[in-house]
């Protein structure tokens, strides 16, 4: 379940506007790179959940992942996550896990199948202070490159609302039909993206 051509950028590091508290993952700024992409760790879970909760609760009334589920995936498969940090603060992230069936199912919301070859993208979220800056597309582009560097991952899959399908189609995702997963009264479209046959996706994102 997710939110937002691009090339990897090295943007200037914007600062959080006055009145917006820093994420718990922030560290001393003078020792940190201005802009950094890296895989998340369980220590980033609280920061990720705060961003996700604000992004999704007001729109959908639910979160794709709750705090214990974020910790679960960042413990089992941190290599399937990617965070964008500005001066040590998490500002955007993607969390995924492996799946071993042709299509997503209800249990794929909470399971990581270590022998699977499909990366299930659970959530893409951007901090409210950094939206409308093109960060979602840049992060997704970097994430697909990162997945492409992992030989076991052959395909990416996600579920989203119909209105977001055109956004993901820009990244070579294609709709395969309605998703079997429902959340309350919400229904979703399932999208897949092959990581084979796309050489530009095989570059390492440096995560």
Swiss-Prot record:
It comes from Homo sapiens. It comes from the Eukaryota. The modification Phosphoserine is found at residue 205. The lineage of its organism: Eukaryota, Metazoa, Chordata, Craniata, Vertebrata. Highly expressed in pineal gland and at lower levels in the retina. Weak expression in several brain regions and in the pituitary gland. The modification Phosphothreonine is found at residue 31. Acetyl-CoA binds at residues 124-126, 132-137, 168-170. The gene is AANAT. This is Serotonin N-acetyltransferase. Residues 35-194 form the N-acetyltransferase domain. Belongs to the acetyltransferase family. AANAT subfamily. Keywords: Acyltransferase, Biological rhythms, Cytoplasm, Melatonin biosynthesis, Phosphoprotein, Transferase. Pathway: Aromatic compound metabolism; melatonin biosynthesis; melatonin from serotonin: step 1/2. Signal peptide: none annotated. It is found in: Cytoplasm. SUPFAM superfamilies: Acyl-CoA N-acyltransferases (Nat).
């Amino acid at each position: 379940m997710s939110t937002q051509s691009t090339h990897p950028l090295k943007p200037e590091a914007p600062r959080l506007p006055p009145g917006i508290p820093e994420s718990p993952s922030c560290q001393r700024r003078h020792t940190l790179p201005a802009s950094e992409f890296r895989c998340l760790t369980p220590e980033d879970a609280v920061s990720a959940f705060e961003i996700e909760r604000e992004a999704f609760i007001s729109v959908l009334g639910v979160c794709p992942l709750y705090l214990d589920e974020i910790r679960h995936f960042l413990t089992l498969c941190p290599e399937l996550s990617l965070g964008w940090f500005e001066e040590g603060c998490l500002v955007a992230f993607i969390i995924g896990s492996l799946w071993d069936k042709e299509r997503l199912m209800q249990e794929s919301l909470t399971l990581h199948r270590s022998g699977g070859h499909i990366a299930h993208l659970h959530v893409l979220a951007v901090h409210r202070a950094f939206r409308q800056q093109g960060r979602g597309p840049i992060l997704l582009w970097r994430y697909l490159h990162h997945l492409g560097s992992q030989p076991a991952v052959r395909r990416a899959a996600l579920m989203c609302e119909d209105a977001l399908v055109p956004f993901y189609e820009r990244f070579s995702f294609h709709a395969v039909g309605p998703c079997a997963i429902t959340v309350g009264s919400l229904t979703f479209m399932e999208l897949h993206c092959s990581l084979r046959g796309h050489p530009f996706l095989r570059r390492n994102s440096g995560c």
